A protein has these predicted regions:
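Glycine-rich phosphate-binding loop and adjacent beta-alpha segment
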Residues: 265-335, 368-370
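NAD(P)H dinucleotide-binding glycine-rich loop of Rossmann-like/cofactor-binding domains
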Residues: 92, 105-118, 125, 138-200
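Glycine-rich beta-strand-centered segment in the early N-terminal region that forms part
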Residues: 70-85, 99-145
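Mid-domain Rossmann-like dinucleotide-binding core that forms the NAD(H)/NADP(H) cofactor-binding site
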Residues: 171-242
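A short acidic, Gly/Pro-enriched loop at the edge of an enzyme's catalytic core
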Residues: 249-257
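N-terminal membrane-anchoring alpha-helices
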Residues: 2-42
Length: 370
């Protein structure tokens, strides 16, 4: 088994690196120029402030510009944004890293230059085919261009905000909380009483994963640094391991599900502390320009056919029904938000820099309210 795994792993690595190199070479053949239809504002059109990402690079490539205010298509909703949230998804897209992702996001420059994804705001107008929302509704969801005063989205990518939930708290949910929910429910297939370990319990996804796993009846162990131990415990974790003092992969406890946002231990190390038919769900991993966090999932995919345990990558998808479920958890008091820092729209580059450091406790918010 080990020999077949190593051969398959090597072949797939060669293919992945070749594709990545091809994408990188092509990326250097294209100039980074303003996209047509964005820089040019129609005469008499309304404008708005928006953060724009025209080129791959550091946060310095992000610019705050006046662009044309969007109008909703027949199946779209126009929302005035009051708050947005930062995710690793944003800065991976900003840098075009790992390079392999450029095959989808654009080789020479980003295809989608409106920046940001998580939003919360008030519906201003709806297309004629929209039935789920109406003008004045408070909504949250995920759509391209969240770091702006307005955006349009399709109604299946959002849900109503409960009356007692703030725009900032609602904006914190979409990518991070949906990733946690789908990882635990769909990939982890958690059952009441199972032992679940969350590696990276103090981050954006991790803080939600701890709470959602508890709401599903699991016995939860959270992994975090010393300064976050009490915070993770306050979210409901039954056990908290300080990774600066103890290595969970060297302990005697066996876990039914491990959700990993960090990628600081090998698959074999994690397998040692998994139950015989346990599940290992990869959400994040170590940085790197070539394959980055994709290296772990590639190895897991190759290993899966040869073992009883299940290992794989979690790729979340924005879903209005899941957002509504998260809203219900908040209404019932089973899900709360940890906000680390707040930034204004003009400070988005600073927010991205802080997110890239990898030490945020919970969520980073972009506030558009006066």
């Amino acid at each position: 088994m080990k020999l077949r795994y190593k051969i398959a792993s090597g072949l797939l690595m060669i293919v992945a690196v070749a594709i990545t190199a091809f994408a990188l070479v092509l990326s250097h053949t294209s100039a980074c120029e303003p996209a047509a239809g964005i820089a040019d504002i129609a005469e008499g059109a309304e404008t708005m402030k928006a953060v724009v990402n025209r080129c791959y690079g550091s946060p310095d490539v992000l610019t705050l510009e006046d662009i044309e205010k969007p109008s909703p298509a027949n199946d779209e909703v126009l929302v005035k944004v009051h708050a947005a949230a930062v995710n690793p998804y944003d800065w991976h897209g900003m840098r075009g890293s790992p390079y392999l992702m450029r095959l989808g996001t654009g080789l020479g420059a980003p295809k989608q230059i409106r920046f940001g994804a998580d939003f919360a705001g008030t519906v201003e107008a709806v297309g004629k085919d929209v039935t789920k929302f109406k003008s004045g509704d408070r909504v949250f969801g995920g759509a391209a261009g969240a770091f702006a005063e307005y955006l349009t989205f399709r109604e299946n990518r959002a849900a109503l905000i409960p009356d007692d939930v703030s725009f900032e708290d609602a904006a914190s949910l979409p990518i991070a909380a949906i990733t946690a929910l789908q990882a635990l429910r769909d990939k982890g297939k958690i059952e009441p009483g199972q032992k679940v370990l969350i590696n990276g319990a103090s981050g954006g996804v991790g803080t939600f994963a701890v709470q959602i796993a508890k709401s599903m009846g699991a016995e939860v162990t959270g992994i975090c640094s010393t300064r976050n131990v009490e915070m993770v415990r306050s979210l409901g974790a039954d056990h908290v391991i300080d990774y600066t003092k103890d290595d969970y992969t060297k302990g005697d406890e066996k876990y039914d599900v491990i959700v990993d946002m960090v990628g600081n231990h090998s698959l074999s190390e994690n397998r040692r502390v998994m139950s015989p038919e346990g599940r290992f769900v990869i959400i994040g991993g170590l940085k790197g320009d070539w394959l980055g966090p994709l290296m772990g999932p590639i190895k897991a995919m190759l290993m899966n056919p040869f073992i009883d345990q299940e290992m794989g990558l979690m790729i979340a998808h924005m879903d209005g029904d899941d957002l509504a479920e998260l809203a219900k958890l908040m209404e019932r008091g089973e899900l709360s938000v940890v906000i680390d820092r707040r930034y204004s729209l003009s400070e988005v580059p600073d927010a991205i820099r802080y997110s890239e450091e990898g030490h945020a406790r919970g969520k980073i918010i972009i506030s558009l309210e006066p």
